[in-house]
Amino acid sequence: MDLAERLDRVEAELRELRDIEAIRHLLSTYGFNADLGRVEQYLDGWSDDGVYDLSEDMQLEGRAALEGLMSDPTGFQKLQIENRSQHLVANLFIKVNGDGAWAEGYSVVTLAGADGVKIFAAGYNHWDFVRAAKGWRMTRRLRRVIGGPTWGGDVIASYLEPAN
């Protein structure tokens, strides 16, 4: 491998690492924005046609639906989540493929109440991303709660790369 090829390889690896870090940052700020009720910043993390697949029975499609989730004054987000929660993402791994990417990880949401802090939800997540003019944006988030009907190895394994 000559110097030019080595330099091309290093540049490609650096670009991928920067993309991975940008996606990791997006997921971190996404959680903070949900916790703090920062609607516009929350929405900025999504593509305009983004889909949030919360459960087998609840999917939100598009910016208007996501905005409704965050800004409905009588909704769960405003009454229970905002300024009372912590969204924590763990065991995160990210795969970039050109202008698309996906991430996998677990999440835990804690809620503070009169009787202390309790785990509200814990589960598996799969995110899809697209590179947009202003950086990476989520196009889809699939969330499945531990103990739900589609929780388990089959859901997780369906997104994992084949073993080499």
Residue ranges and their predicted role:
Residues M1-F32, L36, D44:
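Short, low-complexity N-terminal intrinsically disordered segments enriched in polar/charged residues
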Residues D2-E11, K78-N164:
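A beta-strand edge to alpha-helix "cap/lid" segment located at domain peripheries
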Residues F32, E56, I119:
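Short, charged/polar micro-motifs that form catalytic or ligand-binding hotspots
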Residues G37-Q41, K134-G135:
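Surface-exposed helix-capping loop/turn segments at secondary-structure junctions
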Residues V39-S107:
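A solvent-exposed, acidic/Ser-Thr-rich amphipathic alpha-helical stretch
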